[in-house]
Design a protein with these regions (language model features):
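Short acidic/glycine-rich loops and adjacent helix/strand connectors
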Residues: 1-129
Length: 129
């Protein structure tokens, strides 16, 4: 059984395991040439699949290191800032947070993105903390 592990928030990377043994692993920065690459590890993921000679259709599980429930905590913090009398602090947080929230929201569509980008697959997708 193949299992693919991903990190995306910083130092994006992919690792492919078969029956508990590491087959391939790579950081996206090796391909993108961007130190501490932030984003989806497309090239690292493709490298892992190529090293094993498989496609995404052979992968049973994909795990993403991310805790989606943290959004609730961050939203609560933003609302408490709104309630405070310091409107400039709230405005600064909103301006810095919009790109982050947009990237977090896209995490929920990753299974669809992976199927479209890598050609289908019946894998199970897991958020791993």
């Amino acid at each position: 059984m193949y299992v693919l592990g991903l990190t995306t928030m910083g130092d994006a990377a992919a690792v492919l395991m078969k029956n508990g043994a590491v087959i391939a692993a790579a950081e996206e920065e090796r391909f993108s040439r961007k130190k501490h690459h932030i984003g989806f590890p497309n090239l690292a993921m493709q490298y892992c699949l190529d090293e094993a000679g498989i496609t995404i259709k052979d992968v049973a599980h994909i795990g993403l290191y991310w805790k989606p429930w943290l959004i609730r905590t961050r939203a609560r913090m933003a609302l408490s800032s709104l309630m405070s009398k310091n409107k400039s602090l709230f405005a600064a947080r909103v301006n810095s947070g919009i790109p982050r929230v947009s990237s977090y929201a896209s995490m929920f569509t990753l299974p669809s993105y992976i199927r479209k980008r890598f050609g289908g697959g019946d894998f199970k997708f897991h958020f791993i903390a």
